[in-house]
Design a protein with these regions (language model features):
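Substrate-binding/active-site clefts of carbohydrate-active enzymes
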Residues: 8-182
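Active-site ligand-binding patch in enzyme domains
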Residues: 5
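Basic K/R-rich, polyanion-interacting modules in nucleoproteins and related proteins
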Residues: 1
Length: 182
């Protein structure tokens, strides 16, 4: 049984009883309850009898201001900025990469300790905008073109050219990286 969740949505409510609401660590906490004494966060998910969580994007996405965590901007993360970096707004310290990495790994390990598999939702069909590291590395190579214009079949613009050998290699290596490291 697979349950789709968002790191932010799963514990952000003030009644969730977690120490780190809306964060990787919030989902790693055990023994959390709401005011009514009902299980929340990880314990709630475990009580559902699920076998896997499919976590909405947790790679670095663009439209959340990581410098203003109290601002509570909302986004599910389908605006990729860097495919191989954990999202900073879900960490307790977005300015230090090692914190993002450690806390995301702690969350995933907590799921595994409970016998829950983790499926990572990664959107490799587009990037947030054309001011991406891919575009800066090799202009127009990593993006699908329709003549002289950028293709927009994904309805997001900035459509990734997965048919390009190096883009395909990048995607495969990225998936392998996440599976191996997390």
């Amino acid at each position: 049984v697979i349950c789709e969740i968002s790191v932010l949505d799963s514990t952000a409510d003030g009644s969730s009883g977690v120490k780190y609401p809306g964060k990787y660590l919030g989902l790693a906490e055990k023994g959390t309850k709401n005011k009514e004494g009902e299980a929340t966060g990880l314990d709630y998910l475990k009580s559902l009898g699920i076998t896997h969580v499919q976590i909405m994007p947790m790679y670095d996405f663009a439209s959340i201001d990581e410098a203003a965590p109290k601002k509570r901007e909302y986004n599910w993360g389908y605006d990729p900025l860097n495919y191989n970096v954990p999202e900073g707004s879900f960490s307790t310290d977005p300015f230090h990469g090692e914190v993002r990495i450690r806390e995301m790994k702690e969350m995933i390990a907590a799921f595994h300790r409970e016998g829950i598999g983790v499926i990572m939702d990664v959107v490799y069909n587009h990037t947030y905008d054309l001011d991406s590291c891919l575009q800066k590395c090799e202009p127009d190579y990593y993006y699908r073109m329709n003549g002289t214009r950028y293709s927009n079949a994904s309805a997001c613009g900035n459509e990734i050219a997965s048919e390009q050998p190096m883009m395909r290699k990048y995607i495969v290596e990225s998936v392998c990286y996440w599976a191996r490291e997390y």
